[in-house]
Amino acid sequence: MPRLFGTDGIRGIANVDLKPTHAYALGRATAHRLAGVGRPIVVGQDTRRSGDMFAAAIVAGATSMGVDVHLVGVVPTPALSYITGAGEFAAGIMVSASHNPAPDNGLKVLDQHGLKLDETVEDELEQLIWNSDQLIGASADALGLSIPNRDLFDLYVNHRLSLAAAISTRLHVVIDCANGSGGLAAGRILRATGADVDVLFDDPDGNNINDGCGATSPGALAKEVVARGADVGFALDGDADRLIAVDASGQVVDGDAVLGVLALDRLARKSLPHGALVVSILSNGGLQKTVEAAGGQIIRTPVGDKYILEGMLVSGAGLGGEKSGHVIILEHTSSGDGIVTALEIMAVMTRAGRSLADLAAAVPMLPQQQRAIPARHRDQWEGDPAIRKAIAAAEARLGSAGRVLVRPSGTEPVIRVMVEGPDGDLVAELADELAALTGERLN
């Protein structure tokens, strides 16, 4: 049987690859494996049209096992994480495909602390999903209840408002909510700092999430930041667990640069635990050089924010994240939260009295190119001699200062190629060559 769980839960095209039957089986499996007697599950969703369908299927599955389900409705993923950990819930299930296009959806399971599951528990859930019809359900008089509970969202909003209240700024901010769930609270929370906040792409219709907007398409935000004369712009993704920034000139500041800005600020204030920053293998070598030159250390993990958090917990680090914009600031949250990241950037800008462009300039990056290649047989790349030979040849041309990474995506049906080195032209050339060969060999 094909593996269901990727690096960020279960994903697929709604009602095609990912069906209500999967959500129903997941509801039953989660209730059986994670929910003890009297402990409910909480379910949230982003703004996709298919969200209601999947949430209803989860409810049907879990309640058939005698477990109550609290429905919080449309919320950011970090909100569901906070709600799950703050309440008496056995687990949380988020219906979201994050930055993916609207036809996709996904199912993320969180443990009682609001954290993503480790792979051992995921494997157990997967076996239960495939065999969910063999699970013994509750009797008719012991079925679980579906409980609408929108008030739970206030727990998250009030906590983030308390973080905002500790910042006093007059920055002019533009935030792109990706027509996703972050729009429910982002503007209100950022305005609590005293900032002048303009909100864009906050009109979800079920089909426009991440469509030409948000963290994966920051071009529209960049134009608006310049046109409005704003100090800084922030782009969330569809479930608001990541953020990409834009400086006053419209220049995109990615997750690596944001992490560098935050790490340098904390190193200077001696408030970076163990002087450590946890990043993925994709993070730019320039970030590593900058942090190490400032007296810090870099710890690298596999790609995926759950691995970032795992690395932070093991090492005692307080800051970690990915180039894609997931940033975890452990003193405030145990998950990536684009709104919290925006608050932290605003705080650093205000404290330093410097522009984001100036702050980011202190974190010079090596030329890096990434390609995403649709691949039907993406899991076969390691056994392909032509691909391995091409990787070795590219590494030889780059020399010791360069890197090549090829990996299957854990969230999309693509192979990802990353090439990094001091010569930008050579980096682009090699990335194109590897992308073309990989697409040819794996399709």
Question: What is the predicted function of each stretch?
Answer:
Residues 8, 43, 80, 93, ...:
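Buried hydrophobic positions in well-ordered alpha/beta secondary-structure cores of metabolic enzymes
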Residues 232, 269-443:
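Phosphate-binding and adjacent anionic-ligand microenvironments
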Residues 38-46, 70, 172-174, 275-281, ...:
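Short glycine-rich phosphate-binding loop at a beta-alpha junction
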Residues 121-157, 162, 248-321, 327-329:
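Proline/glycine-rich low-complexity loops and linkers
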